[in-house]
Design a protein with these regions (language model features):
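Internal alpha-helical scaffold of NAD(P)-dependent oxidoreductase catalytic cores
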Residues: 81, 92, 118, 122-127, ...
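Rossmann-like NAD(P)(H) cofactor-binding subdomain of soluble oxidoreductases
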Residues: 54, 60-145, 161
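NAD(P)+-binding Rossmann beta1-loop-alpha1 motif at the extreme N-terminus of oxidoreductases
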Residues: 1-52, 61-62, 88
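C-terminal substrate-binding/catalytic lobe of Rossmann-fold NAD(P)-dependent oxidoreductases
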Residues: 227-251
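Alpha-helix C-terminal capping/helix-to-coil transition sites in glycosyltransferase folds
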Residues: 68-69, 187, 239
Length: 251
């Protein structure tokens, strides 16, 4: 498959490596031509993913028209910059041909839109899937066993996305609840801030356990109120992502 990764950060790069390892034709798009040229020449993402050699097959382009030649478009841009990237993509976007896989997490500042709402607002109705779960980019790039979930209202699309990424070290489950999966990836960050405060104050394990337990309960209730399935928050994109964010030194 021909896939373009829109974003040259750590997560986009790590997922590009997974896709290349699976035999796909992958191009990374980024906004800074000089940095893309450096990555292409040195085969390392020195800003965001140090110490990991990039595969020779991975291609780079600063030209959105070239990136849009792929049928699969993976949005791996930080949420607050994603709208600008979508605006660049819009002139080339063909909803009958393209499918969008989003891996960014969060809520848009100011509008409070979820990422799927932002994408449909800019690009219009499209084939959309979100990929989320407990997955540090550094570990994925080093082929540490990882499990995530692909979610779409079109379960067959979610299965297609799962097949794109699935290999011996990267397991992808499927879900028909993109709202719940997206909200899990966003809401856990609020709980993670509180977990960091507990660590900083050296309060011990008891309050953190209470925080995580009550935090996932609140995430489930809010997620249900916003249209998600409460059961989704007991999965990889809910409690899984919450645990890895609140307990890891990476965060």
């Amino acid at each position: 498959m021909k896939i373009s990764v829109l974003g040259d950060g750590a997560w986009g790069t790590a997922l590009a490596m997974v896709l290349v390892a699976n035999g796909h034709d992958v191009t990374t798009w980024g906004p800074f031509p000089d940095y893309l040229e450096q990555m292409e020449k040195e085969r390392i993402n020195s800003r965001f993913l140090k110490g990991v050699k990039l595969p020779d097959e991975l291609k780079f382009t600063p030209d959105m028209a070239v990136a849009a030649e792929a049928d699969w478009l993976l949005t791996a841009t930080p949420t607050q910059y994603l709208r600008g990237v979508l605006d660049k993509l819009k002139p080339y976007f063909e909803p009958e041909r393209h499918a969008v896989i989003n891996v960014a997490k969060g809520i848009e500042n100011g509008t409070l839109l979820t990422i799927s709402e932002m994408i449909s607002g800019v690009l219009g109705p499209c084939r959309y899937c979100t990929l989320c779960g407990p997955s540090h980019a550094e570990e994925v790039a080093l082929q540490v066993p990882t499990a995530v979930v692909a979610a779409s209202t079109d379960i067959e699309l979610a299965k297609e996305v799962s097949n794109l990424f699935m290999n011996d070290t990267f397991r992808v489950y499927v879900s028909d609840d993109p709202v719940g999966v997206e909200l899990g990836g966003a809401l856990k960050n609020v709980i993670a801030v509180a977990a960091g405060i507990i660590d900083g104050m050296e309060l011990g394990d008891n309050p953190k356990a209470a925080l995580l337990t009550r935090g996932i309960a609140e995430m489930s209730r809010l997620g249900a109120a916003l249209g998600g399935n409460p059961a989704t928050f007991a999965g990889l994109s809910g409690v899984g992502d919450l645990i890895v964010t609140c307990t890891s030194g990476h965060s």
